[in-house]
């Protein structure tokens, strides 16, 4: 049963550059110990007769049939746009002049 010490919690906070109060350290210590106990209980599961697998869920692609459809006209595509200009969507600039 792994247990996290107060010193380890403080060290983790320092690594993350997070200042922890005494109350937060106590709470984090308790929560991390519960998580570590849960991980330990999962590791105790008997897996000797379980075949190793990369993914427990079968990987199958469920695709719809590729049926041609009538595309939207430019006017229909732009009809829901808040701002359109010269047949194009207008969006606010997100990158400044750098």
Swiss-Prot record:
**Carries keyword Ligase?**
yes
Show the coiled coil region(s): none
Gene3D superfamilies cross-referenced by the UniProt entry: Glu-tRNAGln amidotransferase C subunit, N-terminal domain
- Write out the entry's keywords from A to Z: ATP-binding, Ligase, Nucleotide-binding, Protein biosynthesis
GO BP field: glutaminyl-tRNAGln biosynthesis via transamidation; regulation of translational fidelity; translation
**Which GO molecular-function terms appear in the entry?**
asparaginyl-tRNA synthase (glutamine-hydrolyzing) activity; ATP binding; glutaminyl-tRNA synthase (glutamine-hydrolyzing) activity
**InterPro entries per the UniProt record, alphabetical:** Asp/Glu-ADT_sf_sub_c (IPR036113), GatC (IPR003837)
Please give the superkingdom of this protein's source: Bacteria
E.C. number, please? 6.3.5.-
Catalyses which reaction? Answer: L-glutamyl-tRNA(Gln) + L-glutamine + ATP + H2O = L-glutaminyl-tRNA(Gln) + L-glutamate + ADP + phosphate + H(+); L-aspartyl-tRNA(Asn) + L-glutamine + ATP + H2O = L-asparaginyl-tRNA(Asn) + L-glutamate + ADP + phosphate + 2 H(+)
Which leading EC class covers this enzyme? ligase
Entry similarity comment = Belongs to the GatC family.
- PANTHER family associated with the record: GLUTAMYL-TRNA(GLN) AMIDOTRANSFERASE SUBUNIT C, MITOCHONDRIAL
Q: How does it assemble?
A: Heterotrimer of A, B and C subunits.
Role, per record: Allows the formation of correctly charged Asn-tRNA(Asn) or Gln-tRNA(Gln) through the transamidation of misacylated Asp-tRNA(Asn) or Glu-tRNA(Gln) in organisms which lack either or both of asparaginyl-tRNA or glutaminyl-tRNA synthetases. The reaction takes place in the presence of glutamine and ATP through an activated phospho-Asp-tRNA(Asn) or phospho-Glu-tRNA(Gln).
NCBIfam families for this protein: gatC
What is the protein's name according to its record? Aspartyl/glutamyl-tRNA(Asn/Gln) amidotransferase subunit C
Q: What gene is this protein a product of? A: gatC
């Amino acid at each position: 049963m792994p247990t996290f010490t107060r010193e380890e919690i403080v060290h983790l906070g320092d690594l993350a550059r997070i200042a922890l109060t005494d109350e937060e350290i106590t709470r984090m210590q308790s929560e991390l110990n519960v998580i570590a106990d849960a991980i330990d209980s999962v590791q105790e599961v008997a897996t000797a007769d379980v075949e190793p697998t990369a993914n427990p869920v079968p990987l199958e692609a469920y695709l719809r049939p590729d049926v041609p459809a009538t595309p939207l006209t430019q006017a229909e595509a732009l009809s829901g746009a808040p701002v359109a200009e010269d047949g194009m969507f207008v969006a606010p600039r997100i990158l400044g002049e750098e």
